[in-house]
């Protein structure tokens, strides 16, 4: 860390500390299965053909709840490879690997096709790029009538 004037920058922060701290927790942010299900209760019309993305999914605590209560395929995206490795192990443990997969990526550079998603989920993670920016950019990836939660 930079000791000049006691100013530290995020570039000097060791992001491995984040992984070490959060890797063995069920969730990497606020929330609970009950909160996930409450938010999900406002979303309807999902089918087995629905495509869902969980942006900033971490190790997948909320993603696995979504998968157990929705049809369709879910892609979880997170910046940290260690979280995605754990995410995919969790999907296998719950026998969800056929419709739930984790990928490493950045929520500010999505690789999804425009207007391809029925639901974009980001439980406690959109703040990483800013709420307004996330809404403005991510809505382009939603099908007409799609949801962002």
Task: Enumerate the predicted regions with their spans.
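Class I SAM-dependent methyltransferase Rossmann-like catalytic core
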Residues: 18-30
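Conserved alpha-helix/loop element of class I SAM-dependent methyltransferases that forms part
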Residues: 29-48
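A short glycine-rich, Lys/Arg-flanked "PGG" loop and its adjoining helix->strand segment in the class I
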Residues: 133-147
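Class I SAM-dependent methyltransferase SAM/SAH-binding core
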Residues: 53-55, 59-109
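A structural alpha-helix within SAM-dependent methyltransferase catalytic domains
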Residues: 40, 64-67, 135, 139
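A short acidic, Gly/Pro-enriched loop at the edge of an enzyme's catalytic core
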Residues: 108-119
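N-terminal, positively charged/glycine-rich alpha-helical extensions of SAM-dependent methyltransferases
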Residues: 1-20
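A short SAM/SAH-binding and catalytic strip from SAM-dependent methyltransferases
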Residues: 119-132
């Amino acid at each position: 860390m930079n000791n000049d004037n006691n100013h530290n920058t995020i570039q000097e922060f060791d992001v491995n500390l984040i992984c070490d701290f959060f890797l063995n927790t069920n969730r990497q942010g606020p929330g609970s299965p009950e909160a996930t299900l409450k938010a999900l209760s406002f979303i309807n019309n999902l089918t087995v053909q629905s495509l869902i993305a969980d942006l900033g999914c971490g190790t997948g605590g909320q993603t696995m709840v979504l998968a157990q209560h929705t049809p369709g395929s879910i892609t979880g995206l997170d910046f940290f490879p260690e979280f995605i490795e754990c995410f995919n192990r969790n999907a296998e443990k719950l026998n969800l690997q056929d419709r739930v997969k984790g990928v490493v990526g950045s929520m500010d550079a999505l690789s999804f096709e425009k207007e391809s998603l029925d639901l974009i989920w980001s439980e406690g993670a959109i703040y990483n790029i800013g709420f307004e920016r996330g809404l403005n950019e991510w809505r382009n990836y939603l099908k007409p009538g799609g949801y962002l939660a």
